[in-house]
Amino acid sequence: MVYLMMDKRGSMNLVKVGRASHIPQRRASYRTHNPLAIMRSNCAGTVKAEKECHEKLNKVGKRVPRSEWWIVSDEVFASLYEKGMGYFFPNHLPIHFCEEF
């Protein structure tokens, strides 16, 4: 599964796409060190799918140095929030929505 994490820190919009075999366990580990971030969406996906998401994030955002997170514009953040993983894979079903701000 690939998943979309989102975090809004003041005026900074942070997003991360990762991959995990056990989504609930991965989300629980995030709550420990980043309790304000939400796991917005997930869908079936491979290492290749995760890489494709990272490539798209490189085009629309700026990677935080030494981090798995990207800073994106308000417009991109809103689109990611609305579409979830569908932002990256518009024809891929099912897209699961997990948490909301």
Predicted regions and their residues:
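Non-catalytic accessory segments flanking enzymatic or RNA/DNA-binding domains
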Residues: 1-101
